[in-house]
Amino acid sequence: MPNASRVVIVAGEESGDHHAAELVKQLKAVYPDLEISGIGGKHLRAAGVHLISDLTRYAVTGLTEIIPFLKIFRKAFQDIKQHLSTQKPDLLILVDYPAFNLRLAKYAKKKLGIKIIYYISPQIWAWKGKRIHLIKDCIDKMAVIFPFEKTIYENAGVPVSFVGHPLVKKIAAAKDKHSGRTSLGLPLNEPIIALLPGSRHSEIERHIPILVNTAKLLTLDNPKLRFVVPIAGTINPDKVKAYFSNQNLTVTFIQGQAIECMSAADFVIVASGTASLECALLEKPMCIIYKSSFLTYVAAMYFIKVKFLGLCNLLANKMMVPEFLQYDCNAIELSRYISNFHNDPNQAKSMINQLAKLKESLSSSQADCSLFDLVVAELPEKNA
């Protein structure tokens, strides 16, 4: 078994930080002498990882949104390169975050010859498909979370294992609606809509004004309607609350606990991303929103080659959940859809049935192995 092996792990966003921390906890429980360092956030720090940088505080996406933080990202990249050169780890685990991590993989493999596992694949099936050539050259093992990704990598000759989706296990432990409302202090018998604007600063700025106006229109039809807004750890709560002040809306703000908020709701409006898949796995009636800067939108229209943005729709290869994107992402369209949805119980039943099938396809029971087993297999047998 590994003895005092050195592992470096890099997770640049909050969701990756959380998933990586779960892996670290499993590794530390069995191999307490493992030396683990890298880039991450509060979850990896709490799991005992020595952090070189924390990039989860600078959660941005898009062409224009990233510009103010370029110096920070460059410094973090130089710092982790120096750390790899000094530490010479037995294994480098890269978690999602492809713009940063694929550059790091190239350096770590070509310059230092480090063994690399990449967990949570870049979305090469959506855009930048040529990245697969770099992956083939630099990554020793892909650990993918969607079954169809395994086929893509196998066809390209890249070593790959489907390790199940980390959210399935997390969702299995989630509270039901009644328990969720009780734990959050929400009323048991009133209609509640959860509003999830995203975890990036640019998403907050673009989505929350739309969500506030949507909530106001919906409340005109149903004054008893309440809203719950989970606030990501990357966001200043006061900034979110300010948008809702003096709007005559009944809103409960919760720090974190997005899954609990979605479980407690009757319906969810969620920004495209990890939370939208969490909502789908909860089998919760929902719709997906997203609005970016104009330049990012134009670039996406040109480069992205998939029909859908929501992960649940991509996986199903059909529009099982409606998407309100860019110019369609507005209060009038959203409120009209939600009002019609609530007046037609068959829509909810159909959506829930489809989401249940999706959830089963991503379960760990379908996986080749666990991420933990995959990582342990790649660590050296130092005492052998």
Swiss-Prot record:
NCBIfam families hit by this protein: lpxB (TIGR00215)
UniProt keyword annotation of Glycosyltransferase present: yes
Alphabetized InterPro entries for the sequence: Glyco_trans_19
Highest taxon above the source species: Bacteria
EC number: 2.4.1.182
Alphabetical UniProt keywords: Glycosyltransferase, Lipid A biosynthesis, Lipid biosynthesis, Lipid metabolism, Transferase
One GO molecular-function entry: phospholipid binding
Family: Belongs to the LpxB family.
GO BP annotation list: lipid A biosynthetic process
The protein's name in its UniProt record: Lipid-A-disaccharide synthase 1
First-level EC class: transferase
Organism encoding this protein: Legionella pneumophila subsp. pneumophila (strain Philadelphia 1 / ATCC 33152 / DSM 7513)
Pfam families linked: LpxB
Role this protein plays: Condensation of UDP-2,3-diacylglucosamine and 2,3-diacylglucosamine-1-phosphate to form lipid A disaccharide, a precursor of lipid A, a phosphorylated glycolipid that anchors the lipopolysaccharide to the outer membrane of the cell.
Listed pathway(s): Bacterial outer membrane biogenesis; LPS lipid A biosynthesis
Catalytic activity from the UniProt record: a lipid X + a UDP-2-N,3-O-bis[(3R)-3-hydroxyacyl]-alpha-D-glucosamine = a lipid A disaccharide + UDP + H(+)
GO CC aspect terms: membrane
Disulphide linkage map: none
Transmembrane segments: none
